[in-house]
Curated annotation (Swiss-Prot):
Keywords: Early protein
Organism encoding this protein: Vaccinia virus (strain Copenhagen) (VACV)
InterPro entries reported in the protein's UniProt record: Orthopox_F6 (IPR009521)
Origin superkingdom: Viruses
Taxonomic lineage from the root: Viruses, Varidnaviria, Bamfordvirae, Nucleocytoviricota, Pokkesviricetes
Family membership noted in the UniProt record: Belongs to the orthopoxvirus OPG050 family.
The protein, known as: Protein OPG050
A Pfam family this chain is assigned to: Orthopox_F6
Length: 74
C-alpha cells in the first residue's frame, strides 16, 4: 500500500513541477449573468462536458454549481 501512495505522491509532484496541473477559477452564476447577454449560462469545468444552467431552476438546484475554484489536469 505504501508503494502505491508513494507513486501517487510522486506523480502529483511531477505534474505540479511540469506545470500540468493548473488552477482555474469557476465563474459563479451571478457573475456570468452580468457578463453574458444570453438566457443560459454555459460552464465548462475543464472536462469534455458542458453544463447548461437555466435561470428558471430553483435555488436549491443552483447551489451545486456554486464554487470558488477547482484544479484541472491538462
Amino acid at each position: 500500500m505504501s508503494k502505491i501512495l508513494t507513486f501517487v505522491k510522486n506523480k502529483i509532484i511531477d505534474l505540479i513541477n511540469n506545470d500540468q496541473i493548473k488552477y482555474s477559477r469557476v465563474i459563479m452564476i451571478e457573475e456570468s449573468d452580468s457578463l453574458l447577454p444570453v438566457d443560459e449560462v454555459h460552464a465548462n469545468h475543464g472536462f469534455d462536458c458542458v453544463e447548461m444552467i437555466d435561470e428558471n431552476i430553483s435555488n436549491e438546484n443552483i447551489e451545486q454549481y456554486k464554487t470558488e475554484s477547482f484544479f484541472t489536469i491538462n
